[in-house]
Amino acid sequence: LQLSDIADISELDSIFVSNVTISDTSGANLVFSCDLSGNQSKKTDDSSSCSSRSSDTDNESDDDEDDDEADGSSDDSGGSEDTDYSTASEDILIATINQFPVQVIAMEKCQDTLDSLIVESEEDLRDAEWGSMIIQVIMTLLAYQKCFSFTHNDLHTNNIMYIPTEKQYLYYKWDGKHYKVPTFGRLYKIIDFGRAIYKFRGNVVCSDSYHPKGDAATQYNFEPYFNDKKPRLEPNTSFDLCRLGCSLYDFVIDEIEENPKSPQNAAKRLIIEWCKDDKDRNILYKNNGDERYPDFKLYKMIARSVHKHSPSDVLNQGYFSRYIVGKKKIGKNAKIMNIDNLPDYS
């Protein structure tokens, strides 16, 4: 089943609700109550921890402060907690709700992450294998962008997984050209869309990670979390490949420095290029080896200063001409993933 095979998606209209009606709960029985005023969330700052190969941007210092406050409030309250809420522990009430809305994320079972593949492989990946991974990821991003004006916003080596396949080749059509891509036994998948931003039928779908108190606050500046005191900053289609390049940089840079012009490092040279900003500076490291933008500031600066690495621009580079074939050279029974014909749902 392909996205283009789905002609009627009218049932998805119910996802977006313009007028929300809150049911009358005046006659409901109170089962349990708790004063949460002493445990309000605190705003996270820009000093969040952020590894280039992960998206751990939780603010540890805020956690410490919350712990201290929790300890202090416990001392001040004395034994009031036991007396105020004793009925909650003594009288256990069970409510059976036959119909209750839930959110479910269903994921395909994959073999492992790209990070593990690179780190744990007994032999280094050949350049052609790097190229296969790169073009599969690019084609996936192109499909998402074509259908949903999509940006992932957290694409690193632990958010790409793969499954084994017996298919020797994948066939794509993009911008009128056909591509024949060797798989080397792996189909690569993008996962973890928690920070993704996309459009569906005129609606912008944006997670609360970008809320002023979210872990990705200030990466962009647009609705629904627009701050009119700062310049508008829309989602950046060059962000994903640059972010992926930053997570791959340390894996490939040694070989590039040893053999900068070797044909065996052609795909790796592409990855190094993705790590350059609009002024051709390495966005990850300074010349002295220090991080240019530590922690979450890397995300913010990629969004603001990198605009040359959108998937469509990258695919037009000479490296990918090796995959282009005439349609007549593709077997009649081959399944072509025609990105040109995918519908625009945005």
Predicted feature locations:
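Conserved structural core of kinase catalytic domains
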Residues: 1-128, 200-207
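Eukaryotic short linear interaction motifs
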Residues: 113-116, 163, 169-170, 196-200, ...
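Catalytic-loop of the protein kinase fold
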Residues: 145-181
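Activation of the activation-loop gatekeeper triad in protein kinase-fold domains
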Residues: 166, 187-196
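Short coil/turn segments at secondary-structure boundaries
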Residues: 118-122, 156, 174, 201-206, ...
